[in-house]
Amino acid sequence: MFEATTILAYKGENHSVIGGDGQVTFGNCVLKGNATKIRMLYNGKILSGFAGSTADAFTLFEMFERILENRKGDLVKSVIDFSKEWRKDKYLRRLEAMMIVMDRERLFILSGTGDVVEPEDGKIAAIGSGGNYALSAARALDKFADLPESELVRESLLIAGELCIYTNTNIKLLEL
């Protein structure tokens, strides 16, 4: 588990939303409270977020963007090619980062070992040290509350920020 952040993705009926907190931690010190760990890719058609080492995450973002361009925005083919490339490269296999990527139809977690996981329910995924808190909150809110997608993600991340010492409540969201 990476003691770095919380990223939550939710694919609702009307919108896909990804959100993350802004805390950057080094050991037991908070270095920054307003970092951006989520991005739009491929002309605003793909959402992504990372947890883990910032330098490693930027390496992965660049690699994924290149593959996404080569695959003309096909998310499924891109995550498969990305995983294959990640597993083949000895340097990449040592990177300490995870990513979530999504469009309006699909949602994937890309692990630090090159694994690709599509959530069982196909609509909620979380990574990072506060990921389990955010995931639990999102599942409960999805089941029992009638919130817009962006509010469900924001509230779930706020709960994670109250519980996880490596996550703050400076939440940023992106939506498709």
Swiss-Prot record:
S-S bonds: none
Stored PROSITE patterns: PROTEASOME_BETA_2
Chief subcellular location: cytoplasm
GO biological process: proteolysis involved in protein catabolic process
GO CC aspect terms: HslUV protease complex; proteasome core complex
Record's catalysed reaction(s): ATP-dependent cleavage of peptide bonds with broad specificity
Quaternary structure note: A double ring-shaped homohexamer of HslV is capped on each side by a ring-shaped HslU homohexamer. The assembly of the HslU/HslV complex is dependent on binding of ATP.
Regulation of its activity: Allosterically activated by HslU binding.
UniProt keywords, alphabetically: Allosteric enzyme, Cytoplasm, Hydrolase, Metal-binding, Protease, Sodium, Threonine protease
Example of a GO MF term: metal ion binding
Protein name in UniProt: ATP-dependent protease subunit HslV
Residues engaged in binding Na(+): 161, 164, 167
Family listed: Belongs to the peptidase T1B family. HslV subfamily.
Leading EC class: hydrolase
Function as written in the Swiss-Prot or TrEMBL entry: Protease subunit of a proteasome-like degradation complex believed to be a general protein degrading machinery.
Enzyme Commission number: 3.4.25.2
Active site (catalytic residues): 5
Cell location: Cytoplasm
